[in-house]
A protein has these predicted regions:
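Bacterial lipoprotein signal-peptidase II cleavage site
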Residues: 20-39
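Extracytoplasmic "Venus flytrap"
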Residues: 49-73, 77, 82-98, 112-116, ...
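Short, solvent-exposed amphipathic alpha-helices that sit
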Residues: 62-77, 157-164, 193-213, 229, ...
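Short beta-strand elements in bilobed, periplasmic/extracellular small-molecule ligand-binding domains
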Residues: 75-87, 182-185, 207-225
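Hydrophobic alpha-helical segments within soluble ligand-binding/sensing domains
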Residues: 94, 150-179, 230-231, 278-283, ...
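Hydrophobic alpha-helical
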Residues: 108-128, 202, 219-285
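Flexible loop/hinge segments that line or gate small-molecule binding clefts
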Residues: 122-156, 160, 172-182, 280-288, ...
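Hinge/cleft segment of the Venus flytrap/periplasmic-binding protein
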Residues: 180-190, 194, 300-339
Length: 339
């Protein structure tokens, strides 16, 4: 069993950096943020400011870990983080929280969006009302926020998903280059920006390097970041494709649900390969029971801490532009790049 810890943070030995895109051109996100000059600065964010920190969904260990990092940063730096989400992942629920942030006088918002454009109008209204907007984990349109804190580029994460799959298949005795590998993607929805970008890159990588693989459902399987749906969808995949070799779950709710479905079917990692992204706490049971060989994660606590720090940094009157650098307490120097 192996965990690939992809992103911790750039100041740690051997780690790679988060990416942070500034408002501007579209496409891949980039490295971080800073003050309006090109030298690294350590300006302090405004003490007493309130950041509304919005996950895609509550009750999920990935987002709860992000909140831990956010709260630790806020306590250390003297501002407030209001972790406000809903157990049902939907545009309507997130819009309600955004509107409430405006009405209650928050200084900024840091949101992981459930939809790439569905929050745009609400966030633009928040900006007009004076709130600063940062996205993290999953983005919106560039003109609906100032900065995006991303865990990596689509290329990095999409290819990583396939490479973990190949590694686990080989450990089962499969030859990924020659065997006909039947596989499927199982994640949250067709509209979540981050997961779909990883899936697209991963699918292109498979077609280029493993043309012998067969996607049994090119429309993919979705479980809407709902734990029960993830289990149900996981069971339906196994029922519909009894000879499936690989299921890639690029979603922190889909992966444990799929693994539970595999375990319920009395299968192990010797029978089927399941991989993806999720936190150690949600996967350790299945690793111990030999249901999963390998999965990936990044340090979402650092990502959450960085998102709220930057949101409050902007709300404190600091300005950023592409090329700027800033020293974030406890994290290190980060740089704004075009997204």
């Amino acid at each position: 069993m192996k965990i690939r810890k992809f992103l911790t943070y750039g100041v740690l030995v051997g780690a790679t950096a988060f990416f942070l895109g500034a408002c501007g051109n579209s496409s891949q996100n980039s490295n971080s943020t800073s003050n309006s000059n090109s030298n690294a600065t350590t300006q302090t964010a405004n003490n007493g400011g309130k950041v509304v920190f919005i996950p895609k969904v509550t009750g999920n260990s990935f987002f709860e870990s992000g909140n831990l990092g956010a709260q630790e940063m806020a306590k250390k730096e003297g501002f407030t983080v209001d972790y406000n989400g809903n157990p049902v992942a939907s545009v309507a629920n997130q819009v309600t929280i955004i509107n409430n942030a405006v009405q209650t006088g928050a200084g900024s918002i840091a949101v992981s969006s459930v939809d790439p454009t569905g929050l745009d109008n609400a966030l633009k209204q928040a900006q007009k009302a004076g709130l600063k907007v940062v996205t993290w984990d999953s983005d919106v349109s560039p003109d609906a926020r100032s900065l995006m804190v991303s865990q990596g580029t689509p290329t990095q994460l999409g290819e990583m998903l396939v490479k973990m799959s190949v590694d686990a298949l080989e450990k089962r005795g499969k030859d990924p280059k020659k065997d006909k590998i039947k596989y499927a993607w199982h994640y949250s929805s067709s509209t979540v920006q981050d997961q779909n970008s990883w899936q697209k890159v991963g699918e292109e990588y498979i077609k280029k390097h493993y043309p012998n693989w067969e996607n049994v459902n090119e429309s993919n399987y979705y479980s809407n970041q709902d734990a029960q749906q993830a289990l149900n969808v996981g069971q339906s995949i196994l029922s519909a494709h009894k000879d499936i070799d690989l299921i890639i779950c690029n979603d922190s709710t889909a992966l444990p649900g799929q693994l539970q479905a595999v375990q319920n079917a009395k299968l192990t990692k010797k029978d089927i390969t399941v991989t993806g992204f999720s936190t150690p706490n949600s996967i350790k049971k299945y690793a111990k029971d030999d249901i999963i060989e390998e999965w990936g994660l990044w340090d979402v606590k650092v990502q959450g801490a960085l998102a709220v720090y930057l949101a409050n940094y902007l709300a404190s009157g600091n300005q950023v532009k592409v090329g700027d650098k800033i020293n974030v307490p406890g994290i290190g120097e980060v740089e704004v790049q075009n997204n």
